[in-house]
Regions:
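Coil-to-beta-strand transition motifs
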Residues: 40-44, 51-57, 67-71, 169, ...
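Short Pro-Gly-centered flexible turn/kink motifs
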Residues: 60, 197-214
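Asparagine-centered strand-capping/turn motif at beta-strand->loop junctions
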Residues: 60-66, 165
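Beta-strand elements of well-folded, non-transmembrane domains
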Residues: 31-33, 51-53, 64-66, 78-82, ...
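Extended, loop-rich substrate-binding clefts of extracytoplasmic carbohydrate-active enzymes
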Residues: 4-53
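Short, structured beta-strand/loop micro-motifs enriched in basic residues and often containing a Trp
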Residues: 184-191
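Active-site/ligand-binding surface loops and adjacent short beta/alpha elements
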Residues: 69-71, 79-156
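Glycine-rich active-site loops that engage anionic ligands at enzyme catalytic sites
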Residues: 146-182
């Protein structure tokens, strides 16, 4: 039995600086005897940040150093200035439902309509009262936060996108996820967990997001 902290084990662990030059920095986290107590796989996680003009690119690379297959989930949690009335505009029209989590942080077995054939999610005072919006099946690869300022956020092919803020807070977090919370029907076999990622021995997985200042 292994106990995983909320949001995973990497969030609050110290990373080593692997490279730092000019407009790019790479940080490394490697498994050790402490990580193995909550996550029984040997790994290296590389997190790179690079400034390119008006863009910030964040790339995460997971490397399997276990002598066998490895299962994992990973995501990002960048936050951007945003206020009530601002609009999250997708690249193309979307019909989306949101999933929700309950007080135990488990996915509720119900979906809630969000937008229908529309590009826009309007930030309202109560949009996050039931916690994050958990979206899947998105056709767009990017979106924009449109208000007094404008940011274009590219999230690529991630299977889940979380959108969250503390109610009334002057920001919004855009969270590309490769994995998602369990529901009440928890699978004992991690290989069957919804959204789980798998790597063969010696394999690696990479994903990135980009935030570009438009105005």
């Amino acid at each position: 039995k292994y106990t995983m902290p909320k949001h995973g084990l990497a969030r609050k662990l110290p990373f080593n600086v692997k490279e730092c030059s000019g407009a790019k920095a790479i940080f490394s986290l490697e498994s050790d005897e402490n990580t193995l107590k909550s996550y029984p796989f040997e790994f290296e996680l590389l997190v790179a940040f690079e400034l390119k003009g008006k863009s910030l690119v964040n790339t995460m690379t997971v490397i399997n150093k276990t002598s066998g297959e490895m299962y994992f989930s990973i995501g990002a949690h960048p936050g951007f200035n945003c206020k009530v009335g601002d609009v999250i505009e997708f690249e193309q029209p979307e019909t989306l439902e949101t999933e929700r989590i309950d007080s135990d942080n488990l996915i509720i077995d119900k979906k809630f309509p969000l937008i229908e054939n529309s590009r826009d999610i309007v930030i309202t005072e109560d949009i996050f009262k039931a916690d994050a919006l958990i979206l899947s099946g998105i056709k767009s690869k990017k979106l924009r936060i449109k208000g007094d300022n404008e940011i274009e956020f590219t999230f690529g092919d991630c299977p889940f996108l979380g959108i969250w803020a503390k109610p009334g807070a002057p920001y919004v977090c855009l969270e590309p996820w490769y994995g998602v919370n369990d529901g009440r029907e928890v699978k004992d076999d991690i290989s069957k967990k919804r959204g789980i990622q798998r790597l063969d021995m010696g394999g690696s997985f990479e994903f990135s997001w980009t935030a570009e200042i438009i105005k």
